[in-house]
A protein has these predicted regions:
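Conserved Class I SAM-dependent methyltransferase catalytic core
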Residues: 1-6, 25
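Acidic/histidine-rich catalytic neighborhood
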Residues: 18-20, 284-285
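Polybasic, glycine- and aromatic-enriched phosphate-binding surface used to engage nucleic acids
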Residues: 33, 43-265, 269
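Adenylate-forming
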Residues: 6-11, 41
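Non-catalytic DNA-recognition/assembly elements of restriction-modification systems
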Residues: 145-154, 250-332
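A glycine-rich phosphate-binding loop feature that marks nucleotide/adenosyl-phosphate handling sites
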Residues: 9, 164-168, 235, 239-245, ...
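Class I S-adenosyl-L-methionine-dependent methyltransferase catalytic core
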Residues: 11-19
Length: 332
């Protein structure tokens, strides 16, 4: 690759102007020494030119390599897995109104409802529930004709265990929830801790028994830069992946107890400030136009604590962070 324009927003003068995200790559079968990268601090602004020794497939001045799927994390960290999959054709999942209406006609079913969590529910504070029949009493089940009808409907296309979710992968402890999809407009992907009683839904991700340090690293600027360059997209929105993003992420090496404690304290501060806005959704809190100043400051302080875990170097911008991460990835 001789030169490259990193991602920018392209538009034309057509009446129905669609947003198109573009990269420009100039390459040949021979090498040159004077390579150039055109970087965009903002995808809607003009680029600035930077000389490069080598331009890799991620359009960064670094060695050539491809990040591929991994079944296990690159580093010694807790496994990230997907949540449970209903595979029920909409029979076992209920909105709050649907749940209340169902309980009115089937009162015995009330204790078998459990809250579930997908990205939409988590980010927008929308209650959603599942009819959870894993430990249902057979005698009670026979008394609930409307529940039996649901089971009969599911049995038509999934005969083996029609009263259960198709795939059950519920954490055994309180866990960290990571939505698969998040808007590219957000500076940070909203993630958070959930009680083990809440069922996480596939295709979203969980880390069972996660720590404040885990939360701090994954909600940091360093991790977001990795996400920005490595993860898949739907339109321009992030499409997170455990096998590509998390399992390949180069966590900081040789972190001291002092550094770790600093990350934990700053991470807790982010959670404390979020809890002050109990009437706001995460969509409200992480919209760049409405993000509270004290929450933004708390994230910036957390970013500094995580930066410090990656060494004493002062990282001026995200380009320096990603180049450092790619170098660390190769060391692992």
């Amino acid at each position: 690759i001789h030169f490259a324009h990193q991602t920018f927003n392209w538009s034309n003068e057509a009446k129905s102007n669609a947003a198109v995200y573009v990269v420009i790559i100039g390459f040949a079968s021979f090498d040159i020494t004077n390579k150039k990268i055109f970087e965009y601090e903002n995808i809607n602004e003009e680029p600035f030119e930077k000389e490069a020794k080598n331009i890799n497939p991620y359009l960064v001045d670094s060695n050539d390599f491809f990040i591929e799927k991994r079944s296990k994390p690159l580093c010694n960290v807790t496994k990230m897995q997907t949540g449970s999959r209903a595979n029920d054709q909409g029979k076992l999942l209920f909105s709050e109104d649907e749940k209340n209406e169902f309980i009115q006609k089937e009162p015995l079913s009330e204790k078998y409802f459990r809250q579930v969590m997908g990205a939409k529910e988590f980010i927008n504070s929308i209650p959603r529930f599942a009819l959870w029949l894993e430990d249902v009493n057979p005698s009670e089940l026979r008394q609930m004709k409307y529940v039996l009808q649901i089971i009969e409907d599911i049995k038509k296309f999934r005969d083996k265990t029609p009263h259960l979710f198709g795939s059950i992968r519920n954490p055994k402890h309180n866990y960290l929830f990571i939505p698969q999809m998040s808007s590219q407009r957000r500076e940070y992907i909203p993630i958070g801790f959930l009680n083990k009683s809440i069922i996480p839904l596939d295709p979203h991700f969980v880390i069972d028994k996660a720590t404040l340090y885990d939360f701090g690293i994954l909600t940091s600027k360093f991790h977001m830069v990795w996400v920005d360059y490595v993860c898949g997209r739907l339109k321009s929105d992030y499409r997170y992946s455990n096998s590509i993003v998390y399992n390949n992420y180069p966590f900081p090496k040789n972190v001291s107890e002092k550094q770790k404690k600093a990350v934990e304290e700053k991470a807790q501060n982010v959670l404390n400030i979020r809890s002050q806005f109990s009437d706001c959704s995460l969509a409200d809190l992480y919209d760049p136009l409405s993000m509270p100043p004290n929450l933004k400051k708390a994230h910036q302080e957390l970013d500094k604590a995580v930066d410090n875990c990656y060494g004493s170097k002062l990282f001026k911008n995200d380009k320096e962070r990603i180049e450092f991460l790619f170098g660390l990835y190769e060391e692992y």
